[in-house]
Amino acid sequence: MRKKAPPLAIAFLLIVAASTSYAAGKRITKLYVSNSEGDNITVIDLATYTVIGDIRVGEQVHGLCAPSDGRRLFTTIESENNLKVIDTTTDKVVETIPLTGRPNQCASTPDGRYVCVPIRNGNSVDIVDIAARKVVKVLPVALPHNCYDADNDDAMFVSSMGDQEINLIDLKKMAYAKKIPVGGIPRPYAVSKDGKRLYAALSDFHGFVIASIPDQKIVARVELPPAPPLACRLEPHTPTHGIELSPDGKELWVTSLADSGVYVYDIATNHLSTAIHVGKCPNWITFSPDGRYGAVSNSGSDDSSIIDTRTRREIARVKVGKGPKRLLAVTVP
């Protein structure tokens, strides 16, 4: 009598088969989720809402970023002070680049030439030349936390928690071009496609601020609806954390850790249009490149909510690793 394969073996074969299918040329969109209290990145197929892989990268995995071609994924590892390069076809680490200190959230230029990495314990930001495989410039910044790409190959943003501002870096000159005050300790933020508006979440504020980048000043302060007291272990002082513009640039999606929800704002009016319930303590938010799906990392329930952006409803909740933090959707060629 033929023996049945054990469940774990079947699961392993399914993952291998899926990976082989993707490597053979099927174009898919993968959601990568960094598990900050573990050593891994969970990989989810956004078309089926299923886990298709697990990438072991090192303890205290933090940042995720990628160039526009989707061929590589960059991740920062706090415990190792390095930046790792992942081939998105195989989901294997192919390169490790040393950094000058403990890294936080990274950002890549669209062409993948440079990666910006805040160095929290160095009060600085590393500019990494990926082709040269090394840090080529270190700029001073007080308590840096998040880098954000400027949607072009010549500029990058980095937030300063110490100076309560967000700085624009000119990558041609390798120097600061602008410093935009945000009126509080900046957490995640988003930048409009035309480069004129900046939307930032702040510590101890259940809402966000809007700043003019050309004028380098705050132009609006928007409070989210009232919510219960914040009780989230990973983000105890940030009731509003995840913040992202929809791919068409018309809406701002903001997570409320205090209310386990996602709030959608029309950026033309700054008016709330939709509230979506998700998992506990929603941390970060991202979109698939085509705007079809939104995804949220729920740090309080160790899962990720998948949202249909047309119906404005959560359509799946996928279990991931411990303490999910950053997440990024990448369409793999």
Each PLM stretch: what is its role?
Residues 1-9:
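Bacterial N-terminal signal peptides that target proteins for export
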Residues 9-17:
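Bacterial N-terminal signal peptides
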Residues 19-333:
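Predominantly soluble domains enriched in secretory-pathway, periplasmic, or organellar proteins
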